[in-house]
Regions:
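Beta1/beta-strand and adjacent pyrophosphate-binding region of the FAD-binding site
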Residues: 20-34
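Conserved hydrophobic helix-helix packing surfaces used for dimerization/oligomerization
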Residues: 28-30, 51, 294
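C-terminal helical "tail/cap" subdomain of flavin- and related membrane-associated enzymes
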Residues: 5-10, 327-417
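FAD/FMN-dependent oxidoreductases across multiple families
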Residues: 9, 88, 249-341
Length: 417
């Protein structure tokens, strides 16, 4: 066992004055009240477990990742989430656009393989995340804001978490801390994806001319020399605009690039621009996403790239599937089983690997031009592409998905000297 893992398993009582026989504060401690954490908390609470959620931020708070996929619609239904006009904009698919060549092509979810929903939503993340948090609270979760985690671990008796103001114990720990990825940092198990996007610069507009997008209100994925950009219509005539590239970016890349293009100029004419933000080094996977009494979920387990809007979908679906395995184990006292989540990880790895294969081709080949701007793909291939774009990536009858997975296996296979 590595030094990092040995430190990780050091009992709490060895480093604090807390009574080692103190009662547990919860069955499950969840770090983070974002989409993955709130989903896990809601579904566990619904089944009668005591769930404590520790969130560092106050809600509502702004986030990107505003375009959802049909693959999460069953989870929203399971949670009892009802779309609201102030939070949701109907999304029927995606439109890929190259302004330099004046080419574009629309992909509608209704053309995917049978099984997935035919639409999704764009959401105001501040309100959407708050709605998910409120649902967890309504089902019985104890959600505490302003809780910055300073230390965490597991021992023979359970899991423990220290914040800047308190200490907590539980039977199980779920890390849904997003890009903070507390477990991965603790165990030094965050492995970057080096062939994906490196940085993103983005902003929002109020009173934008979103009606110029036409009747569909699909996300626009703008193919650009430096990478790609997004244009997402949000409720209340708001607009989310950003650029992603493999190299370093700054505000000039946004202002002199995507925002200077004809579509953005029309959409933002007369609109009020809000703060510009920059994020970088966000693509990674946690190579030890679970163990006895702990698991990572959502972005804390893996984040690929924003290009195909997979993050929130994988977070909600992953959290729901995690609960389906964890809840029976908690009832039976099996939560310390090191092999508890083996089958779950195989399932999630199929989803991650599918999107990773798509993202890698997008950045490193002429895939985007051939598939997304190349005209007629043929019915079978188009349905397969649409199913992946819809986040329906847990199926075994999609030949396009099989192609992506086979290509990744070949690239990762060891070569002879």
């Amino acid at each position: 066992m590595s030094t990092a893992c040995s430190f990780w398993y050091m009992p709490l009582e060895a480093r604090t004055n807390r009574d080692p026989h103190a009662s547990q504060d919860a069955d499950v401690i969840v770090i983070g009240a974002g989409p993955g954490g709130a989903t896990a908390a809601a579904l566990l609470s619904e089944q009668g477990f005591r769930v404590l959620v520790l969130e560092k931020d106050e809600f509502p708070r702004e986030k990107i990742g505003e375009s959802l996929l049909p693959g999460l619609m069953p989870v929203l239904d399971r949670l009892g989430i009802t779309p609201r006009d102030d939070t949701y904009v109907y999304k029927r698919g995606a439109r890929f656009v190259c302004e330099d060549s004046d080419r574009q092509q629309a992909f509608e979810f209704r053309h995917a393989l049978p099984g997935a929903a035919s639409h999704a939503w764009h959401v105001d993340r501040a309100l959407f995340d708050t709605q998910l948090r409120d649902r967890a609270v309504a089902l019985g979760a104890d959600v505490r804001h302003g809780q910055t985690v300073t230390d965490l671990g597991v021992d023979a008796r359970g899991a423990w978490v220290k914040t800047d103001s308190a200490q907590y114990r539980g039977r199980y720990l779920i890390d849904s801390s997003g890009q903070s990825r507390l477990l991965a940092r603790r165990n030094q198990t965050a492995e970057p994806y080096k062939r994906f996007g490196h940085s993103a610069v983005y902003t929002h507009y109020e009173e934008a001319n979103v009606e110029l997008l036409g009747p569909d209100f699909d996300i626009r994925i703008m193919l650009r020399p430096e990478g790609w950009g997004w244009i997402i219509p949000l409720p209340g005539r708001r607009l989310s605009v950003g650029v992603v590239a493999k190299g370093k970016l700054g505000r000039p890349n946004l202002d002199g690039g995507l925002l200077a293009g004809p579509l953005c100029e029309k959409l933002t004419d007369g609109a009020k621009r809000l703060e510009t933000n920059l994020v970088s080094n966000y693509s990674y996977k946690n190579t030890m996403p679970s163990g006895p009494r702990f698991a990572a979920a959502g972005d804390a387990a893996c984040f690929l790239d924003p290009v195909f809007s997979s993050g929130v979908t994988l977070a909600l679906r992953g959290a729901a599937d995690l609960v389906d395995v964890l809840a029976p184990a908690l009832r039976d006292g099996r939560e310390a089983d090191a092999a508890l989540l083996n089958a779950y990880h195989v399932s999630m790895q199929r989803a991650y690997a599918t999107f990773a294969g798509l993202v890698e081709r997008f950045y490193n080949t002429r895939f985007a031009e051939s598939y997304f701007l190349g005209g007629d793909l043929g019915d079978d291939l188009r349905r397969g592409v649409m199913s992946v774009l819809a986040g329906d990536v847990w199926r075994y009858d999609n030949t396009f998905q099989d192609m992506l997975l086979s290509a990744r296996r070949r690239r990762s296979a060891p070569t002879a000297n």
